[in-house]
UniProtKB/Swiss-Prot annotation:
One of its GO terms (biological process) is tRNA N1-guanine methylation. Belongs to the RNA methyltransferase TrmD family. This is tRNA (guanine-N(1)-)-methyltransferase. GO terms for molecular function: tRNA (guanine(37)-N1)-methyltransferase activity. The keyword Zinc-finger does not apply. Transmembrane segments: none annotated.
Length: 235
């Protein structure tokens, strides 16, 4: 699995991606990171990558010609790469989308800055636009890290216990509550069903709690799974 990241701040990577499970997988060669400095494709002595938008307006836009040279260099080395632009205008990034992206094997993530990029870049190269949520952040680098982390977790060999992937939140509802020792803490006890050692009862409880939490907090996930919203209580 190869991720090419196009950014004007290459030193931000690998950043958090160099730690824990994803970082270990990077060191083991289960995935690779190719960071490309967009500024190196600027044509002037100041390495200018942005300019004022036509028609006026606040801020600056990343230039199409500079981005084009950068993208072309990646396509020359990786002609089959999937082009993804992290943008607030994009389709919401989901677990399902993460699975789809992983199948491409080679992903190029363009990290926008300033007020975004010249729209012609998206159109000419047919970028898939992806948003990590309905909020604004300073640039696309953090969004790219979120996408990479989510995708890398599904690469074979990265997560040791395959059950961890199938039981995670968003597969078909939110994850059930989990507890560890001590059995009682600050007057709050672990549910008895989890202490009895009956695996069937535990699974039933987990399914029930997953459903209840999803109905209360994210009923839209149940619709995506083909479920119906029903009133429930934790009894």
């Amino acid at each position: 699995m190869i991720f090419n990241v196009l950014t004007i701040f290459p030193d931000m990577f690998p950043g958090p991606l160099g730690y824990s499970t994803v970082g270990n997988a990077l060191r083991k060669g289960l995935w690779s990171l190719n960071v490309v400095d967009i500024r190196s494709f600027a044509s002037d002595k100041h390495s200018t990558v942005d300019d004022k938008p036509y028609g006026g307006g606040p801020g600056m836009l990343m230039k199409a010609d500079v981005l084009g040279r950068c993208i072309d260099s990646v396509l020359e080395a990786h002609p089959d790469t999937r082009l993804v632009y992290t943008s607030p205008k994009g389709k919401q990034f989901t677990q399902d989308m993460s699975r789809q992206i992983v199948h491409f094997g080679n992903i190029t993530l363009l990290c926008g800055r300033f007020e975004g990029i010249d729209e012609r870049v998206v159109d000419v190269y047919n970028f898939q636009e992806v948003s990590i949520g309905d909020y604004v952040i300073s640039g696309g680098e953090l969004a790219a890290m979120v996408v990479i982390d989510s995708c890398v977790r599904m690469v074979t060999g990265v997560i040791g216990n395959k059950d961890s992937l199938t039981r995670e939140s968003f597969d078909c509802g939110l994850e059930y509550p989990q507890y560890t020792r001590p059995a009682s803490w600050k007057g709050v006890s672990v549910p008895d069903v989890l202490l009895r050692g009956n695996h069937k009862e535990t699974e039933l409880w987990r399914c029930k709690m997953s459903r209840i939490i999803t109905e209360r907090r994210r009923p839209d996930l149940l619709k995506d799974c083909g479920g119906e919203e029903e009133g429930s209580s934790n009894e």
